[in-house]
Amino acid sequence: MIDYQEVLSRYRPTQEEENRLRIISDDIIRKINSICRSRRLRAEAVIVGSYAKGTNLRDGDLDIFIAFDRDYPEEIINTEGLHIGHAVIPNGREKYAEHPYVSGEIGGVKIDVVPCYKMSFGDRKISAVDRTLLHTEYVNGHLDEKGRDEVRLLKIFTKSIGVYGAEARTFGFSGYLCELLVIRFRSFENVIRYFSKAKGRVLIDPDERFRDPMLLIDPVDP
């Protein structure tokens, strides 16, 4: 029988690492908010990702979003987002997704500073990354400490078999998908049990628009 607590003890962040992440993230958030005030921007820093949800594994990274009011034109949040990102990560590199963003390291921790639009439940997204703010809120409202460790176990398992990660080279299980599966099935073992019995495609799509082997509806979508 697998000793899950022993597995978690090897992959869960140490208290020292958690303290380092907290100090670095608090400092960056303070700097971003100060810059936003000085530039009279209606925007604020928000910590998102697995660290914000307490499902992070050891040697993880930090995702910090700059959430702008929804009436800003896209070119403004792109320009200001890059300016702020470079200001708080001096040696950062520009990367490009739906919005350009700045990625770099501080104190040995990989950090992404990403601009987005503010979004509340029921709002239509303006850009794809906007929902990330709601993902954090949703997961934190549906996972307790035990559930967070169950997510960690699912992440560890999917990493070990090479199916963790939503990027094009993998098309696997994202961290958010792992969180939603544990919320739905309550435990790592229940998730594995469900997929071990699933036949063919796992699909919930009344309009039959998708051909993916598995489809899970994002609960924060209106």
UniProtKB/Swiss-Prot annotation:
* Keyword set includes Hydrolase: no
Enzyme Commission designation: 2.7.7.72
Q: Would the keyword rRNA processing be found if you checked this record's keyword annotation?
A: no
- InterPro entries (alphabetical): CCA-adding_arc, CCA_tRNA_nucleotrans_2, NT_2-5OAS_ClassI-CCAase, NT_sf, Polymerase_NTP_transf_dom, tRNA_NucTransf2
The cofactor(s) it depends on are: Mg(2+)
Which residues are CTP-binding?
A: 50, 53, 135, 155, 164
Reproduce the miscellaneous comment text: A single active site specifically recognizes both ATP and CTP and is responsible for their addition.
Q: Which family does it belong to?
A: Belongs to the tRNA nucleotidyltransferase/poly(A) polymerase family. Archaeal CCA-adding enzyme subfamily.
Write down what this protein is called. CCA-adding enzyme
Organism from which the protein derives: Thermoplasma acidophilum
Q: What is the lineage of its organism?
A: Archaea, Methanobacteriati, Thermoplasmatota, Thermoplasmata, Thermoplasmatales
